[in-house]
Design a protein with these regions (language model features):
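Histidine-centered nuclease catalytic patch
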Residues: 27-57, 66, 70
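Short microdomains enriched in Cys/His and/or Lys/Arg
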Residues: 45-62, 80-94
Length: 104
């Protein structure tokens, strides 16, 4: 059975993972340990797209901390600044799946 368009849009392709890994030097952007490029800035559950501008390299511990603890706000603020530095014109609203391409 084919995947829904939304589901495909939220997945992180191997090409995106490779680009993000290179962008982040293979290290967790929070603590500097070796990491994997599989963390969504805007979560998949919130329709966050699997695009470079929404993906971060994090180690396992920091990924869990970002997803499941009260540190999320502090981490999110840092990640937002980090992504803005990497992508001039970075816009959080462009990171969310929008079936109808309607401006929010």
């Amino acid at each position: 059975m084919a995947k829904a368009k939304r589901t495909k849009s939220l997945e992180i392709s191997q090409l995106v993972k490779k680009k993000v890994y290179e962008r982040d030097g293979g290290c967790c952007v929070w603590c500097g340990k070796p990491g994997k490029p599989n963390a969504h800035f805007i979560a998949r559950s919130q329709s966050g797209l699997g695009i470079e501008e929404n993906i971060l390299t994090l180690c396992w511990d920091c990924h869990m901390r970002y997803d499941q603890t009260t540190n999320r706000r502090k981490m999110r603020d840092y990640f937002k600044s980090y992504l803005k530095l990497k992508y001039p014109g970075w816009d959080e609203e462009k990171l969310v799946y929008n079936k109808w391409n309607v401006e929010r």
